[in-house]
Amino acid sequence: MKKRLSLVFAALMALSMIAGCGASNSKDAAKDTSAAPATSAQTSADAAAGTVSTDGSTSMEKVIGALGESFMQNNKGVTFTYNPTGSGSGITAVSEGRCDIGLSSRSLKDEEKKSGLKETTLALDGIAIIVNPQNKVEDLDIETIGKISTGEIKNWKEVGGDDAEIVLIGREAGSGTRDGFESITKTEDKCKYGQELTSTGDVITTVSQNPNAIGYASLAAVKDNVKALSVGKVKPTEETVKDGSYVVQRPFVLVTKEGKALSDTAQKFFDYVTSADASQIISDAGAVPVK
């Protein structure tokens, strides 16, 4: 079941006005009722107040959540929301004007760009090939991963594991992670999935509970309850994703509408997350910043 994650932080500022007592002449009354000038802090808070709505990739949950939290802490009065619906749904949402910024864990397709959408790469993310911690297999190459995915290789003993049937766990159609995985392994529309799930978290949980399962998930989301395999003898890390030696990777993309201005608050958020100031937050969340 898709869940809705809403990160909401609001700072309410109390303003008081001092009304002067009545005076015997209009000159004194004017002095008593004159408004005090706004402080610089009040002006800054008012300028930042507003809402930023994002929608899309579940793989980007950790990264976008950390960025949204940081933005709200630095901009009192802002409401930030994130709806984890999947890359395809997020792209549709921004196209239809249902959110400010779409989130995709794949690049836009040519037809999506032609429809008036624009992509901005926020970060790079490895797609980890994950198995149950009990699995003896430690490394697979791309060709072997492809053969497992299409069902050409059906048993773990064929790749150095136990005598057990391989169960492929993947994402639903429209997922950016699935699109990236199938594109890299050249298995588009050929994968024999045992289960197709609607979120990165569901894939990780399912693999962690099945000793014969193999799946794929955002490296930023992988925890100790699953084992990430090396691919072609290269382990998935921030360094190997950044230098390109770990080949199973894809971009984290912000999607906006070409020619349509964002609200002041949404633009401020966009500028912040794509600046060098956000790099450490992105890195701490497990992705590789591009700045």
Model-derived segments and spans:
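Positively charged n-region of N-terminal signal peptides that target proteins for export
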Residues: M1-L7
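Exported/periplasmic ABC-transporter solute-binding proteins
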Residues: R4, G22-G88, T92-K291
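Sec-dependent N-terminal signal peptides
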Residues: L7-M13
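C-terminal motif of bacterial Sec signal peptides marking the signal peptidase cleavage site
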Residues: S16-G20
